[in-house]
């Protein structure tokens, strides 16, 4: 999103203390889209624009541009997109904290939460995973507390 487009949308650059984002997880044409137009738009990045820059990189560049110095960016994405996400954030934010989210303890992470700070030079930190379910399918105690608002996700 260009600075002009951000201003037209009422978004002032370098002013946000916190930007939370859930970018589209998939590229258009690489998955079967929902027949619901709003869902399809939310789940798949639009077809390539005039830019050679990947969609995720453009999305996160726009998010980072909204942050004031010291502002925090929090992103949720697919775990298999971690490399692309790190590449997109390189040079824009620092102090990255990565929280893998696993469906169950014995399964690999399917999602990641990434928090970063504009202007930080702190090193990347890989946090212990957030495990959502016990082997029997019940929520873990922490996941249950998070859902009920009794605990926070430590990022």
Regions found by a protein language model. Give the residues of each.
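SAM/dcSAM-binding transferase cores
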Residues: 109-155
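Mobile active-site "lid"/loop adjacent to the S-adenosyl-L-methionine
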Residues: 14-18, 23-58
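A short acidic, Gly/Pro-enriched loop at the edge of an enzyme's catalytic core
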Residues: 2-20
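Residue-level detector of flexible, active-site-proximal loop/helix-junction positions
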Residues: 2, 102-105, 120
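Short, glycine/acidic-enriched loop or turn micro-motifs at the edges of active sites
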Residues: 3, 25, 118
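Generic structural "secondary-structure junction" signal
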Residues: 27-28, 43, 103, 126, ...
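Conserved Class I SAM-dependent methyltransferase catalytic core
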Residues: 51-109
């Amino acid at each position: 999103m260009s600075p002009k487009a951000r201003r037209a949308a009422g978004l002032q650059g370098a002013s946000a203390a916190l930007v939370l984002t859930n970018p589209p997880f998939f590229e258009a044409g690489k998955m079967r889209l929902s027949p619901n137009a709003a869902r399809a738009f939310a789940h798949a990045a639009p077809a390539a624009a005039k830019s050679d820059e990947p969609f995720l990189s453009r999305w996160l560049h726009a998010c980072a541009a909204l942050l004031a110095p010291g502002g925090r960016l929090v992103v949720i994405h697919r775990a298999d997109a971690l490399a692309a996400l790190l590449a997109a954030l390189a040079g824009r934010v620092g102090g990255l904290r990565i929280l893998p989210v696993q469906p169950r303890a014995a399964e690999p992470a399917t999602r990641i939460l990434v928090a970063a700070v504009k202007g930080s030079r702190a090193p990347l930190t890989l946090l212990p995973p957030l495990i959502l379910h016990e082997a029997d399918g019940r929520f873990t105690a922490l996941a249950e507390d998070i859902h009920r608002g009794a605990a926070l996700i430590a990022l």
